[in-house]
UniProtKB/Swiss-Prot annotation:
High-level lineage: Eukaryota, Viridiplantae, Streptophyta, Embryophyta, Tracheophyta
Function field: Produces ATP from ADP in the presence of a proton gradient across the membrane. The alpha chain is a regulatory subunit.
Compartments, record wording: Plastid, Chloroplast thylakoid membrane
Protein name, entry field: ATP synthase subunit alpha, chloroplastic
Gene name of the encoded protein: atpA
Similarity remark: Belongs to the ATPase alpha/beta chains family.
Assembly information from the UniProt record: F-type ATPases have 2 components, CF(1) - the catalytic core - and CF(0) - the membrane proton channel. CF(1) has five subunits: alpha(3), beta(3), gamma(1), delta(1), epsilon(1). CF(0) has four main subunits: a, b, b' and c.
Keyword Nucleotide-binding: yes
An MF annotation (GO) of this entry: ATP binding
Keyword presence, Isomerase: no
Length: 98
């Protein structure tokens, strides 16, 4: 990669793009630019137990409830806007053109 004695300047050429190994061991890890873990865990650390993992079911249920609420809120706003438009046009004279 880069030696400590190398000075990089704008316009310097690149010999090749840095590559890192990819495996299941890197999933969910925090790594630096040199693909070295910086989260304090070993590369082959065991996965957390099922009990200690956060439940995603509650998050999905909350997200669905929020979506349903927002859809209902949008519908109510549309009804308010359309009724306001009708109310604002109630005093106007309508001319039909044939």
């Amino acid at each position: 990669i880069v030696n400590t004695g190398t000075v990089l300047q704008v316009g310097d050429g690149i010999a090749r793009i840095a590559q890192i190994p990819v495996s299941e061991a890197y999933l969910g890890r925090v790594i630096n630019a040199l693909a070295k873990p910086i989260d304090g865990r070993l590369i082959e650390s065991p996965a957390p137990g099922i009990i200690s993992r956060a439940s995603s079911v509650a998050q999905v249920v909350n997200a669905l409830q929020e979506r349903k609420f927002l859809v209902e809120l949008r519908t109510q706003f549309q009804e308010i806007i359309s009724s306001t438009k009708l109310r604002n046009q109630a005093d106007q004279t309508i001319t039909l053109i044939r």
